[in-house]
């Protein structure tokens, strides 16, 4: 899925976490096409490096907004991430995950996450983590205009001895 991702590029963000377990945050990151030594748009035909600026129509942009609720034994969150002009931060690839979408495609991703842990460790009951992402690609053909991914994780703590951890995903 494309909903979550990391970036060390230029950006700005904010978060609000009151003391009641709720949290909301939003951030925007942008990647200038300064590294495009190519003749493709927006670099032009000379193949020269061009600085496209911050938050311009030509810069790659990711805008993510997340809301969540956390308590000591459980948590749930949802994120919406709108990526434009070819922003990419995918970590896996089995062919072209964007199908036949243009390289400068826009996409909208939604991600859902939740976890729960038992009151006591050292039992047969594991903690559980769940996640689901779905992405819609604006310029892909109708047969390849969405993708989705999910995960399920189980984790046992202190089962055989203190501080041991066993996990399956």
List the predicted regions and their residue ranges.
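Transmembrane beta-strands of outer-membrane beta-barrel pores
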Residues: 28-32, 71-73, 80-86, 132-138, ...
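Outer-envelope beta-barrel architecture signal
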Residues: 10, 18-24, 63, 72-76, ...
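Residues on the lipid-exposed face of transmembrane beta-strands in outer-membrane beta-barrel proteins
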Residues: 12-16, 65-69, 112-116, 152-156
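C-terminal structural cap/anchor segments
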Residues: 132, 136-169
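Transmembrane beta-strands of outer-membrane beta-barrel proteins
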Residues: 1, 25-29, 77-81, 129-133, ...
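Surface-exposed coil loops of outer-membrane beta-barrel proteins
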Residues: 1-62, 96-97
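Surface-exposed extracellular loop regions of Gram-negative outer-membrane beta-barrel proteins
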Residues: 23-27, 113-134
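Residues that define the transmembrane beta-barrel architecture of outer-membrane proteins
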Residues: 6-10, 59-63, 106-110, 144-150
């Amino acid at each position: 899925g494309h909903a979550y991702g990391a970036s060390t590029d230029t950006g700005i963000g904010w978060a609000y976490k009151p003391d009641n377990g709720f949290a909301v945050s939003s951030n925007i990151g942008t990647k200038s096409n300064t590294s495009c030594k190519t003749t493709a748009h927006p670099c032009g035909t000379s193949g020269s490096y061009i600085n496209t600026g911050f938050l311009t129509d030509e810069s790659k942009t990711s805008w993510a907004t997340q809301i969540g609720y956390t308590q000591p034994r459980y948590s749930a969150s949802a994120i919406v991430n709108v990526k434009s002009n070819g922003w990419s931060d995918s970590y896996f690839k089995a062919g072209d995950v964007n199908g036949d979408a243009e390289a400068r495609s826009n996409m909208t991703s939604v991600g859902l996450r939740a976890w729960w842990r038992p009151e006591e460790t050292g039992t047969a009951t594991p903690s559980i983590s769940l996640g689901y992402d779905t992405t819609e690609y604006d310029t892909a053909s109708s047969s390849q205009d969405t993708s989705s991914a999910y995960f399920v994780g189980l984790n046992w703590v202190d089962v055989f001895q203190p501080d041991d951890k066993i996990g399956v995903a």
